[in-house]
């Protein structure tokens, strides 16, 4: 599977991160002695040299705000993303499947924690981020507003949703902000396993009884377009891509990554013996890529606005969990204060 290639890319990004930390940046540039150097010049030099911006470094306010928005949205997605899969933990078809799914859902919680911690290095508290999610002031990925109707949906989420997540996130391992890049390296290694377990569920179903095969095909039919939409609006309508790429936060535009995902999935669908629900899908020899029908971007906009099939249910569930967990947070804070000899 292409997952190997993506993992290779993660390892290269990890090596580049270590190499970058060993190089120093020349911040004097070609500037004449008469001109005073600004913090903005230093920031630009670090970005241009493919070094990492660290929490202690000066950064433009807009760079900080963009990172908080993207990292928080990503963290919220991991946490909300536990719901559609958690829905199947008690109904997984065997003990082995249950144990694997439990581990995967726990991984998503872990990813949320690494990401909230990365956002906190930008000077914002986790309480504030969670409040913004619950009040609808920050977003989470559109994909988690679709329901998981059958066991095959767990396979389709692993194969397609985690597959899309990896294609989108491997370039983020090279993000210019150090704490986000480091979190992404760890997350991508785990996502690669998640994608394989989804592929394996679908492979088992597609080689099972006719009923299991139909269930697998139906799940792929329903998850294909929402997965394509995960990459965001087309570049021409993307508010942030250009500036985020100039800052080295995003490395590729939304359309480029969507295309890579399609090119990765088509041969994998053949191995599964399943079809992708797009009559327009064909090899385009001139472009050396697959031509495909894009997702319905009006639907994406509706889901992002809060009008997807499960938006209200997802947020209501999250708010309930937050309320019900209040006593745990209070007890943990009281315990920590007692141990340090202070008051909560
Ligand atoms: N859903 O200018 P654009 C996972 C918003 S976790 C909702 O292109 P950007 C997993 C966008 O925020 C998956 N909103 O934005 C977890 C912006 O609105 P605002 C999450 C979306 O940021 C558990 C507006 O549309 N992955 O995979 O440059 C289990 C214009 O868009 C979406 C990440 O978060 C969307 N799909 O690019 C299994 C990865 N798309 O904020 C799996 C990190 C766009 O101006 N994030 N919007 O009001 C990114 O890479 C980028 O933020 C995006 C969007 C590519 C998603």
Residue ranges and their predicted role:
Residues 1-63, 95, 326-344:
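Extreme N-terminal leader/anchor segments
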Residues 2-21, 214-344:
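Extended, helix-rich structural scaffolds rather than catalytic motifs
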Residues 22-40, 104-132, 199-202:
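Conserved alpha-helical segments that form or flank metal/cofactor-binding pockets of metalloenzymes
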Residues 52-72, 132-158, 175, 208-212, ...:
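Acidic/His metal-coordination segments adjacent to aromatic residues that form catalytic metal sites
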Residues 57-63, 81-103, 165-180:
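Helix-loop segments that flank and shape redox-cofactor active sites
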Residues 63-74, 92-111, 154, 179-191, ...:
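Alpha-helical scaffold segments that form or flank carboxylate-/histidine-based iron centers
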Residues 146-197:
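Internal, conserved structured core segments that host functional sites
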Residues 175-226:
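Glycine- and acidic-residue-rich phosphate-binding/metal-coordinating active-site segment common to enzymes
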């Amino acid at each position: 599977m292409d997952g190997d290639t993506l993992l290779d890319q993660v390892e290269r990004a990890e090596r580049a991160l270590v190499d970058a930390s060993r190089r120093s940046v020349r911040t004097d540039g070609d500037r004449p002695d008469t001109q005073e150097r600004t913090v903005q010049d230093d920031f630009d030099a670090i970005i241009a040299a493919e070094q990492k911006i660290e929490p202690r470094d000066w950064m433009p306010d807009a760079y900080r705000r963009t990172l908080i928005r993207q990292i928080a949205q990503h963290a919220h997605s991991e946490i909300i993303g536990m719901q559609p899969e958690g829905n199947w933990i008690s109904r997984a078809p065997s003990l082995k499947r249950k144990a694997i799914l439990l581990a995967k859902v726990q991984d998503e919680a872990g990813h949320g924690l690494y990401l909230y911690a990365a956002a906190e290095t930008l000077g914002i508290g986790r309480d504030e981020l969670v409040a913004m999610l619950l009040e609808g002031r920050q977003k989470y990925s559109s994909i988690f507003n679709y329901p998981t109707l059958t066991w095959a949906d767990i396979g389709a989420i692993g194969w397609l949703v985690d597959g899309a997540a990896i294609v989108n996130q491997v370039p983020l391992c090279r993000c210019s902000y150090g704490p986000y890049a480091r979190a992404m390296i760890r997350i991508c290694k785990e996502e690669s396993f998640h994608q394989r377990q989804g592929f394996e569920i679908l492979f088992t179903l597609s080689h099972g009884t006719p009923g299991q095969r139909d269930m697998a095909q139906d799940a792929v039919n329903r998850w294909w377009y929402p997965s394509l939409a995960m990459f965001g609006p087309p570049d021409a309508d993307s508010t942030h891509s250009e500036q985020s790429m100039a800052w080295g936060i995003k490395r590729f535009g939304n359309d480029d990554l969507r295309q890579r995902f399609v090119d990765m999935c088509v041969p994998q669908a053949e191995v599964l013996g399943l079809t992708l629900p797009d009559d327009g899908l064909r090899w385009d020899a001139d472009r050396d890529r697959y031509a495909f029908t894009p997702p319905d971007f009006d639907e994406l906009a509706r889901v992002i606005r809060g009008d997807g099939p499960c938006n209200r249910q997802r947020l209501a569930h999250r708010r309930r969990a937050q309320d019900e967990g209040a006593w745990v947070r209070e007890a943990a804070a009281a315990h920590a204060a007692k141990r340090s000899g202070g008051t909560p």
